[in-house]
Swiss-Prot record:
Principal EC category: oxidoreductase
Catalytic reaction annotation: (S)-malate + NAD(+) = oxaloacetate + NADH + H(+)
Name this protein carries in UniProt: Malate dehydrogenase
SUPFAM superfamilies registered for this protein in UniProt: LDH C-terminal domain-like, NAD(P)-binding Rossmann-fold domains
Positions contributing to substrate binding: 83, 89, 121, 152
Domain of life: Bacteria
Lineage of source species: Bacteria, Pseudomonadati, Pseudomonadota, Gammaproteobacteria, Thiotrichales
InterPro entries: L-lactate/malate_DH, Lactate/malate_DH_C, Lactate/malate_DH_N, Lactate_DH/Glyco_Ohase_4_C, Malate_DH_type3, NAD(P)-bd_dom_sf
Enzyme Commission identifier(s): 1.1.1.37
Length: 319
């Protein structure tokens, strides 16, 4: 049985962490691509030398040539300019569209059948651009957003309630930005709804609202603390969870930026936006779940924000 091949486009902090986690999870051989000469090669050599210590036996290669992506089973894209203090995800739009064009063409010519996960921000627009330039079908391309946002929501809830984070089920829908929608109605702690926990006085509505707000600003909080970069451990872990579900046909239902068809969740056009999504060996399948009227209204605001950015991206491409 042939070993799987994971291509990581972008050898920065997220790319390097993705490579390390791929080896630890024993997902397959790794190709680390970057346009910076020496960077992917150096990180690949360092990672390769960790394999005897980690007890794994996989190949790790660094490259500046898109041809080395040939026959990749999974491609995870992190290439692009990261957020800096005071910069929104949307400020990155013009710069990273050009990056997605180069990456998309690299995928199209070398591994068009790969399962593609986009992590580059602004996420919902970049995954749309990546599909445009790569030609990858709807079921084989997805954006990493909701897994990370939901993990942040779960972390903050567990910390506030002083419970194991493994007992907290919490979900976030919508765009990967300030308009994301943490689903308080669907979220629970060991089966007990957040609404019930508020009634029992375990958490106040004010504290819950502040956690929702903190979740929306989760990435910005880390950017402000780091000052010279953005999050990478949790984003990489989220990307690997998605890749593993595909490679091992785990059929996990994860909140991801999948392409939903017009009519689903009230959208009037096909659109990449964060929704519950099954990831299996067949690719991605968006799933409809019932949400409250308030959450529907919030989701529509988020959808509109994504649509506006898509329009802005289209204008940039037209000029």
């Amino acid at each position: 049985m042939a070993r799987k091949k994971i291509a990581l486009i972008g050898a920065g902090n997220i790319g390097g962490t993705l490579a390390h986690l791929s080896l630890i999870k024993q997902l397959g051989d790794v190709v680390l691509f970057d346009i910076a000469p020496g960077m992917p090669q150096g990180k690949a050599l360092d990672l390769l030398q960790s394999c005897p210590i980690e007890g794994v036996d996989f190949k790790v290669r660094g490259t500046n040539d898109y041809k080395d992506l040939e026959h990749s089973d999974v491609v995870i894209v992190t290439a692009g300019v990261p957020r800096k203090p005071g910069m929104s995800r949307d400020d990155l739009l013009g710069i990273n569209i050009k990056v997605m064009q180069a990456v998309g063409e690299g995928i199209k010519h070398n591994c068009p059948d790969a399962f593609v996960i986009c992590i580059t921000n602004p996420l919902d627009i970049m995954v749309n651009m990546l599909q445009k330039f790569s030609g990858v079908p709807d079921n084989k391309i997805v954006g990493m957003a909701g897994v990370l946002d939901s993990a942040r929501f779960r972390t903050f809830l567990a910390d506030e309630l002083n419970v194991s984070v493994q007992q907290v089920q919490a979900y976030v829908m919508g765009g990967h930005g300030d308009t994301m929608v943490p689903l308080t109605k669907m979220s629970n702690v060991a089966g007990v709804s957040l609404e019930q926990l508020v009634k029992e006085g375990k958490i106040s509505q004010e504290r819950l609202d502040s956690i929702v707000a903190r979740t929306r600003n989760g990435g910005g909080e880390i950017v402000a603390l780091l000052k010279t970069g953005s999050a990478y451990y949790a984003p990489a872990a989220a990307g690997i969870q998605m890749a593993e579900s595909y490679l091992r046909d785990k059929k996990m239902i994860l909140p991801c930026a999948a392409k939903i068809k017009a009519g689903m969740y009230g959208v009037d056009e096909d659109l990449f936006v964060g929704v519950p999504t099954e990831i299996s060996a067949n690719g991605v399948r968006p799933i409809h779940v019932e949400i409250s009227e308030k959450e529907k209204e919030q989701l529509q605001v988020s959808i509109n924000a994504v649509k506006e950015l898509n329009k802005a991206a289209a204008e940039i491409l037209a000029n």
